[in-house]
Amino acid sequence: MVDIAATLIHWYAENKRELPWRETTDPYRIWISEIILQQTRVVQGLEYFNRFMLRFPDVRALAEAPGDEVMKYWQGLGYYSRARNLHAAAKEIVEKFGGEFPRNYSDVLTLKGIGEYTAAAICSFAWKLPYAVVDGNVYRVLARIFGIDTRSEEHTSELQSRLHL
C-alpha cells in the first residue's frame, strides 16, 4: 500500500512556496493571512499581506487604527466585510483578552468573522493544537482516498467522522 502521508510530505518538500505565514507561529499573522486568502489568489494576497503587516504589525495596531484606514489598506481585495470583521475582532482581542490572541479553539471561534476553518488553522499552526484544517480541496482528496461520495450530507458527515471533526 502507498504511504499517503510520506508521498504528500515528499511532494510538499519538492513543490512548496516560501510564504511568510508558513514561517511563523504568530497567531495574529496566521489569522490575517487566512482572512486575506479567502476568495483571493495567493499571489495577490501576498502583496496585501505584506502591506497590511507593515501598517498593522500586531493586534493592538489594528484595533487602534481608524476604520477608514483599515478599509484603505484592504481596498482592491473585495469582500470588505472581511476587513470590518478583522477590525472588530482585533478590538475584541484587546478588550476581552488583554491584547493577547486567545489560545483555545472555542475562544478563537467567538471572534467576529472567524469560523471553524480559520479557528482550526490558527490553533493548529500557532499552538500545534490537534485541529484539522480541512477546506474543500482537502475534502476532495480525502473523499477520493476513502472512496466517499461527498455530494450528500450523509456522506460528508461520514468523512467528517473519519477525520474526527
Protein language model annotation of sequence segments:
Residues 2, 6-153, 157:
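Catalytic cores of DNA base-excision repair glycosylases
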Residues 158-165:
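Short "domain-exit" segments at the C-terminal end of structured domains
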